[in-house]
Amino acid sequence: MKKIIIILSLLIIVVAIGFLIAKKDQSYSATDVLENADFNVKNPTITIHTVDTDKEDIYTKIEIPEETQKKLIQAFQNAKFDKTTINPVDYDYRITISLNTGYTMYLVSDKKSLNLLSNHENYAIVNDNDFFSILEKATK
């Protein structure tokens, strides 16, 4: 009987450790991050503003061609994200992705992170699928 209790205790510990490891290594899709976003809408768009807190009007809209918008949205859709507790304060961009609804976020390019306005969650983009390189080319 003592052996069974020891074996069950060890089994529970192993399962708990496995669960914690799996939870820690969990990455999220764009649909998870944007809370059930529908990327299959007819005319998705992306609006990009640079953020410069030294100016009176801190947002400057950047005109993005439609083809580049499609590439950015597709790259974002295919990216993978990890939740993070880091809350950056020096944002580079304010982006709104319009799908079935508008999803506004702030981005920090060098840290490859974002902050969603809808729920104030912070994410690190672990596999950006060239999102930031496309964004950099589009904003030059």
PLM features: residue spans?
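Function-determining sites in protein domains
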Residues: K2-L10, V15-K140
